[in-house]
Amino acid sequence: RVIVVPGDAQPLFIGTPAEVMRLAPIAPPVVELGRLAGWSPLPLTVRDARRAAGPLRNLLVGHTPPLRAIDGELGSEALVVATDLTVRYGQRPALRSVSLTIRGGEVVALMGRNGAGKSTLLSAIVGLRASAGGSILTGGKDPRTLRGADLVHAVGLVPQEPGDLLEATTVADECRAADRDAGADHGTTRALLVLLAPDVIGTTHPRDLSEGQQLLLALAVILAARPPLLLLDEPTRGLDYPTKARLVEVLRDLARAGHGIMLATHDVELAAEVATRVVVLAEGEIVADGSTADVVISSPMFAPQVAKVLAPEPWLTVSDVLSAIGPLLLRSHAPTSGDAVG
């Protein structure tokens, strides 16, 4: 059985996994796809969904997933250029001859196993790691030469533990300190936080916030300086579904505004939802770099649930399917004239 604790003084909901998933306001992508397609019994696994997906695949014939591309004008500026970059920890190479460019408007998912070099690459981009070979330019400059205001106005990094960036004793003090450090107008960070997390109270100690709230506060602190490049290290670790959905919206808005974004993540569903490009690292080397669909579908390890259900066609998310054939699905579920309507 599954017990759902909805919060807001609402009663518990107890039932079998299928009963709970059919009614739950949030659910894994494979369940959302089953609900959208009207499958019964509702599949709870990719294997069961593939068995039920034949009619849905037929409906998708002749349709193509939405193109994930950046605005040509936004993508003209190179925010990061790495050329044959090598980074070592002692004698051990952490990055080996890495070459890549990140432009404004891109959302790049940096993926790979633990120890592949993802966090090391983010650290090199902000100047925390010296190169043992090759070069890296952030905003056209060697990031290790950037200090203080020059650094925060060029690039922002949200680490795996966002709380590490938060030092004040209240949220309000944190916002004031961020305004001061960024040289921003008074109230800038607080205004950003209201947009990102309107339920956060200014008198709260940052350590008393949830992990999701700490992440959004850290994001507001970094965005106060308006850096064109934003880096996030495992941003969905510990987040619940609603906060993760909010983060996806925020990242899309930032990309549309021209920010370049790189996410180091194991979250294939996040990459499927928001990334325009995926870079895969293995033992410090880039082994794949291309559009999200091309990269994640070619590897079972990185394929999201919807891609596994609808393979070999390049559908990545439930929202992709809905945007293509949503009206057809609604008509197919509509009652006929002979059906009883409740």
Q: How should these model regions be labeled?
A:
Residues 265-266:
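H-loop/switch region of ABC-family ATPase nucleotide-binding domains
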Residues 14-75, 302-342:
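ABC ATPase nucleotide-binding domains
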Residues 184-202:
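Conserved ABC ATPase "signature" region
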Residues 271-273:
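A short, surface-exposed alpha-helical micro-motif characterized by mixed small hydrophobic
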Residues 126:
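Helix-to-loop junction immediately C-terminal to a conserved catalytic motif
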Residues 134-142, 151:
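Conserved ABC transporter NBD signature motif
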Residues 8-9, 284:
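Conserved ABC ATPase "signature" C-loop
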